[in-house]
């Protein structure tokens, strides 16, 4: 991994001080699902200074305050997806978070990262703009607040200054009659970026007519925006298929006006119209509720001190002393600050069961449990496990024995070449710890971040289901 100076902070004030000192040569580290890939590849965008803010507890969590809901930028997408507060007031945001990446990615990736990366395909930004969200940017000079829609200049560029930190995302609670939906179109159901997406909200009056409409497409315009021309078509009208189809065509036309005709237009022009129509139909067809994808857990940043502080300098990555519990054993380790958890486990601790596959978080071969959550160890910086518990395949069962999952995999011939098996077992354990009797769909969703090139998955699904049955 490319060398860098590593600095860990534990308060917003410390983060602002570090940004003031280093500015444009600094990149923030929270979940690290994008940054660690850049560092490993030696990307030109790779920074000289990595500022680890994952331990700033005041930037995590979801809070209700009067008529508003506030999101900490360190809140993970897994936490958004299972939030009862969002399920009640903003289900479209939870739906968008649940569509991101894989269980391993959602356990690490943060809302702040999804916003500040400013990728046109960011799934949670359209729902937040539909909700009327604002963001707070803070520096040593003070705070400023602006509408989320005004934050973006163009893809991958925001109006935040080099010394500013995103510290809060806030939106008003929708009215009790508001219904919403989020639709994403990708190449597969997991680990796929959005080719197109739509966030939609509708509010109906007592007479059944539409009194409020919001439509925000994703990956369709240069930056995210409400398509007010399409929204105006809906106001005062009775909802119906023909009306929604007209709104979809209007969105499609506005997209062409903004982007012109390109190689992808032939596909996107009809598809965005259909997605808009379907999203509006879903607003009426459901109350926006869904089954939580995982058990509620405390935010990552509340699990103890994270990271290790080092002097402010431009020397190559110094070593860090970390303390963690790995497979039930408390350990104190001195590691390079630029080492990831995968290399720590395999090369320094002699635990080769965790496999090195794609190294970009797409195959799941390196999956371990971090405080019970499945994560890609290739995308976790080793200093970030301080104060936390790591479980690898070697720690699944007592020495000389097998875990019920391992026995079930053998009984169902679910391990062929075996390369994916350790990660698959850990993802399955996280699922069964939450729900001992999962449905077929829940099993497939839980292992959606683990690729197998041998079995076709059916034997794996059967093995997990069998291991979860009592007796």
What function would you assign to each model-found segment?
Residues 1-315, 320, 325, 369, ...:
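C-terminal structural segment of proteins
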Residues 10, 68, 75-76, 230, ...:
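Signature of N-terminal electron-transfer/Fe-S-associated modules in redox systems
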């Amino acid at each position: 991994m490319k060398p860098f100076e590593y600095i860990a902070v534990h308060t917003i004030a410390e983060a602002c001080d570090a940004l003031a000192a280093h500015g444009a040569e600094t990149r923030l580290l929270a979940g690290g699902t994008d940054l660690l890939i850049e560092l490993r590849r030696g990307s030109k965008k790779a920074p000289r200074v990595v500022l680890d803010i994952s331990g700033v507890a005041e930037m995590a969590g979801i809070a209700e305050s009067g008529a508003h809901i506030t999101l900490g930028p360190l809140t993970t997408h897994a936490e958004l997806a299972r939030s009862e507060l969002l399920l009640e007031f903003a289900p479209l945001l939870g739906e968008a978070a649940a569509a991101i990446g894989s269980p391993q990615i959602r356990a690490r990736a943060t809302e702040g990262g999804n916003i500040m990366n400013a990728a046109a395909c960011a799934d949670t930004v359209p729902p937040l703009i539909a909700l009327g969200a604002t963001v707070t940017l803070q520096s040593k000079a003070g705070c400023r607040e602006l509408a989320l829609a005004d934050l973006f200049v163009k893809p991958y560029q925001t109006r935040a200054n080099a010394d500013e930190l995103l510290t809060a995302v806030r939106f008003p609670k929708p009215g009790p009659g508001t219904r919403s939906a989020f639709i994403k179109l990708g190449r597969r159901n997991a680990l796929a970026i959005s080719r197109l997406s739509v966030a939609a909200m509708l509010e109906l009056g007592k007479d059944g007519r539409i009194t409020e409409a919001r439509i925000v497409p994703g990956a369709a315009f240069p930056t995210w925006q409400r398509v007010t021309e399409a929204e105006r078509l809906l106001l005062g009208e009775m909802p119906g298929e023909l009306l929604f189809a007209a709104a979809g065509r209007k969105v499609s036309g506005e997209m062409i006006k903004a982007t012109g005709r390109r190689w992808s237009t032939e596909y996107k022009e009809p598809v965005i119209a259909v997605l808009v129509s379907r999203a509006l139909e879903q607003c009426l067809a459901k109350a926006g509720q869904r089954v939580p994808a995982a058990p509620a857990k405390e935010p990552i940043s509340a699990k103890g001190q994270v990271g290790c502080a080092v002097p402010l300098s431009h020397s190559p990555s110094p070593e860090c002393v970390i303390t963690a519990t790995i497979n039930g054993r408390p350990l104190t380790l001195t590691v390079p600050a630029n080492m990831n958890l995968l290399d720590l486990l395999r090369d320094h601790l002699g635990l080769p069961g965790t496999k090195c596959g794609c190294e970009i978080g797409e195959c799941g071969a390196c999956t371990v449990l971090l405080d019970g959550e499945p994560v890609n160890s290739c995308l976790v910086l080793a200093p970030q496990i301080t104060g936390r518990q790591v479980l690898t395949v070697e720690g699944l069962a007592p020495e000389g024995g097998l875990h019920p999952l391992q026995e079930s995999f053998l009984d169902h011939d679910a391990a062929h070449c075996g390369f994916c098996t350790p990660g698959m077992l850990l993802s399955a354990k996280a699922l069964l710890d939450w729900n001992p009797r999962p449905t077929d769909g829940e099993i497939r969703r839980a292992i959606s971040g683990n690729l197998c090139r041998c079995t076709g998955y059916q034997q794996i699904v059967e093995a997990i289901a069998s291991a979860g049955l009592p007796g």
